[in-house]
């Protein structure tokens, strides 16, 4: 390690000490906890907000917020993944501060440009609810100040997740205290925007020692622009093809079908947040390992990751598919019973997205294979468009769900094709087979119960308990038989108590 400035060295020493105590599993726990918290909290607050604000004001908020978020998205460019990767590579270097400031200068400049454009849009083009639109500009300032990518690159997940969870709890409390009628929409916007604003200042406080005083180097900043733009392409492509389903459903089918799809999609997004968290945590670790030439250690982590992610993916996917007939009418009401088919179809995409997430976040991006990543996402977007065009008019929301499965499958295959000569795909795919088999046996066991079950909560709980017991038992037997490293470590730790 080169000679670091004293404050930066102090932070780095703290980081090294915490890395010894806080391993990857702990980081994953923090990130999964946050992802689940962030997904579940809106489900808790939604009934209150919808009653207090009403449908019209909620629509105004949703539209203005979405637009502001897109301006912010363009301001961030591809810094989330790119900045994370670069900080991971340089966190032991004496120029860590310079690396940060040169990347942040691009982010700040782009975000400032988007902020000015948004203010211009608000002044000259927004007629109704202009004040609300102006207040939502806080979200673009949030993008301007967002340095979570730096702390992720330093593997400081405890700080980022704890900070974000505290702020979300405070904003939720403020909403319950201050929002009482549709006339409080402005207060609601200020609370939600102010919350993320406070969160960013807390992250800056945590990072202040490592980043040091502002140091700007125009040449270095300009060198970051092209790779940031390259990694921005998949951000836009993913954003488009995740929205495409809803846009095409709204145009080619009924509003009811759109409602069914959106309801089912929220459950899938909540379930897959576990997989997303895994990739977020592992990406900086894998980047550091590969940049230091520790290829064998990196591939060891990948094998463990594939086993962990696919164990979860098959459990979630086939678990949802098995209980969907009872879950849909119990959770949403009998009018949403047909959501069971949509939920089941979307669940089939989870193993594809899980495996692709490991390949993308733990190999493609850490090794700078941005072109392969972009091609795979574009192929997914195009295939989603074609599948939706053919299927939505015939099957409605179910067609959109099948289009998502096809798109996720093609993205997964394309990413596997890109790394086929670099890693042993067969070794990783073989790890998934036992979990797939355990999932199918679980599904068969639950289906036996489903034939006699009636739509009640006790029967749903019985199905979940039986399915979970079967899957966990079979998976643990396999992991024990193969002497899985993580399981053996936990058993050894438990036996010493």
List PLM regions with ranges:
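Short runs within selected transmembrane alpha-helices of multi-pass transporters and secretion channels
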Residues: 38-42, 46, 65-72, 76-84, ...
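Membrane-proximal transmembrane or re-entrant/amphipathic helices at the cytosolic face
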Residues: 1-15, 444-497
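Signature of the first transmembrane helix
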Residues: 2-9, 20-80, 172, 229-255, ...
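Hydrophobic transmembrane helix module of multi-pass membrane transport proteins
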Residues: 4, 105-237, 242-243, 448
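Interhelical loop/hinge segments that connect adjacent transmembrane helices in multipass membrane
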Residues: 4, 9-20, 24, 158-161, ...
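Alpha-helical transmembrane segments of multi-pass membrane transport and lipid-handling proteins
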Residues: 2-5, 36, 43, 75-76, ...
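Helix-loop junctions and terminal segments of transmembrane helices
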Residues: 46-47, 75-91, 264, 268-306, ...
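Transmembrane helical elements of multi-pass membrane transporters/channels
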Residues: 26-42, 167, 187-203, 207, ...
């Amino acid at each position: 390690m080169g000679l670091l400035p004293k404050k930066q060295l102090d932070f780095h020493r703290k980081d090294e000490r915490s890395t010894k105590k806080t391993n990857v599993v702990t980081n994953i726990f923090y990130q999964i906890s946050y992802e689940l918290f962030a997904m579940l909290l809106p489900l808790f607050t939604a009934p209150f907000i919808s009653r207090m604000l009403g449908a019209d004001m909620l629509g105004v908020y949703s539209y203005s917020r979405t637009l502001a978020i897109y301006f912010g998205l363009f301001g961030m460019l591809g810094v989330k993944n790119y900045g994370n990767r670069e900080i991971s590579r340089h966190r032991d270097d004496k120029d860590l501060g310079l690396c940060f400031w040169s990347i942040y200068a691009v982010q700040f400049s782009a975000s400032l440009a988007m902020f000015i454009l948004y203010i211009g849009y608000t002044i000259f083009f927004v007629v109704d609810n202009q004040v609300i639109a102006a207040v939502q500009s806080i979200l673009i300032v949030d993008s301007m100040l967002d340095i979570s990518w730096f702390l992720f690159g330093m593997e400081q997940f405890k700080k980022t997740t704890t900070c974000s969870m505290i702020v979300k709890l405070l904003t939720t409390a403020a909403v319950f205290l201050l929002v009482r009628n549709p006339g409080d929409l402005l207060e609601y916007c200020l609370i939600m925007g102010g919350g993320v604003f406070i969160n960013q200042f807390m992250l800056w406080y945590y990072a202040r020692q490592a980043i040091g005083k502002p140091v700007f180097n125009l040449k270095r900043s300009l060198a970051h622009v092209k790779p940031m733009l390259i990694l921005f392409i998949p951000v836009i492509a993913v954003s488009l093809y995740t929205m495409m389903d809803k846009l095409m459903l709204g145009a080619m089918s009924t509003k009811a079908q759109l409602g069914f799809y959106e309801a089912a999609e929220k459950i899938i997004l909540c379930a897959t947040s576990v997989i997303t968290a895994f990739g977020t945590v592992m990406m900086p670790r894998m980047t550091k390992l590969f940049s230091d030439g520790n290829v064998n250690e990196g591939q060891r982590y990948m094998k463990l990751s594939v086993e962990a992610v696919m164990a979860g993916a098959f459990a979630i996917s086939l678990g949802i598919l098995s209980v969907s007939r009872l879950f849909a009418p119990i959770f949403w009401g009998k009018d949403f019973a047909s959501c069971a088919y949509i939920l089941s179809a979307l669940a089939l995409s989870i193993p594809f997205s899980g495996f692709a997430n490991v390949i993308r976040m733990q190999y493609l991006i850490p090794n700078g294979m941005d072109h392969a990543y972009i091609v795979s996402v574009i192929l997914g977007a195009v295939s989603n468009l074609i599948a939706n065009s053919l299927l939505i008019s015939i099957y409605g929301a179910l067609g959109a769900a099948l289009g998502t499965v096809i798109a996720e499958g093609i993205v997964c295959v394309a990413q596997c094709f890109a790394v086929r000569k670099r890693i042993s795909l067969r070794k990783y795919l073989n790890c998934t087979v036992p979990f797939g088999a355990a999932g199918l046996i679980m599904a068969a066991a639950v289906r036996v119960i489903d034939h006699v079950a009636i739509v009640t909560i006790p029967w749903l709980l019985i199905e979940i308990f039986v399915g979970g017991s079967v899957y966990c038992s079979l998976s643990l037997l396999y992991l024990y038989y193969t002497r899985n490293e993580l399981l053996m470590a936990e058993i050894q730790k438990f036996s010493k108590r």
